[in-house]
Amino acid sequence: MLVLGIESSCDETGVAVYDSESGLLSHALHSQIATHRVHGGVVPELASRDHVNYLVPLVDEVLTKAQIRKNQLDGIAYTAGPGLIGALLVGSCFAKSLAYALNIPALAIHHLEAHLLAAKMETPSLDFPFIALLVSGGHCQLIEVNNIGEYRLLGDTLDDAVGEAFDKTAKLMGIPYPGGAVLANLADQCLSTPYQFPRPMTDRPGLDFSFSGLKTHALNTWNQSEKKESDRSEIAKAFQQAVVETLIIKCKRAIKESQSKRLVVAGGVGANKALRSALQKWIKDIKGEVYFPALEYCTDNGAMVAYAGCLRMMRGESDGGLGVMVKPRWPLA
């Protein structure tokens, strides 16, 4: 089965072609960082307009790379939520219209489900059940994954998502948008730090997260410093250490409570070097397994949507009718 995947939930336009027999045939991505940098964050209206401009060229690009024609496609999968409503509507309307023109099924895909399954796309031998740590700019969750569509939420953030906390902390210290990755690089390059930040919500039972207080702690530390480059790097390192250790502590609890020693890390923050290294060390110590998507599939992309769509379409699933129903807020579990 050949499935075209379309991702347009926020500020990246992703398109891919996945084959149930041969795997991922091609994918292409347009990032809108340059468009939004001048505004210091994502502007929803501009994001929607950018998707309109790039969807058709990207579809043509992936079909050419895959050496297939539109009429060879068996289905089209698209992100229907959660995300920015305008951006979601652009991708969903395009997908439904193209599917109608080609007389093939279209299927709405949950953005978070696509992230959860991204590691399985590259490692088909990854079996259910597993625990997933979903860490991105909009989410920070621990999820028990028992099968496709069978999810149980174990823990969620009570305020900021972890990627959001990275970006906001960077901005508070004068690092321009998108500053989260820059903050992480500063932390990686800093050899040591005199600062010790709190590990939020690790002193109580449960698997929920909270990062707003950590962000405030970083701001206060920055304001009390001389605001030199060395201060920025040392605060970045202390902040990242606190985030990583907090995530590790919560993952340990989740694994201990479950019957599986398989951990899947999904979402853009899954590309963080310090987090990857710490998780790999810990999971090795307990003789468990940890799976990460390749770096290019950690952030939003069309490949994960095409893959999730292919799995569901092979089970006979598809949208009913031409109606477009996107869900800006859409709980996974």
Swiss-Prot record:
Principal location listed in the UniProt entry: cytoplasm
Cofactor info, note text: Binds 1 Fe(2+) ion per subunit.
Enzyme class per UniProt: transferase
GO biological process, one term: tRNA threonylcarbamoyladenosine modification
SUPFAM superfamilies per UniProt: Actin-like ATPase domain
Gene3D superfamilies: 3.30.420.40
Cofactor(s) annotated in UniProt: Fe(2+)
Reaction(s) catalysed by this chain's protein: L-threonylcarbamoyladenylate + adenosine(37) in tRNA = N(6)-L-threonylcarbamoyladenosine(37) in tRNA + AMP + H(+)
Residues where Fe cation binds: 111, 115, 300
Cross-referenced PROSITE patterns: GLYCOPROTEASE
Protein name per the record: tRNA N6-adenosine threonylcarbamoyltransferase
Species assigned in the record: Legionella pneumophila (strain Corby)
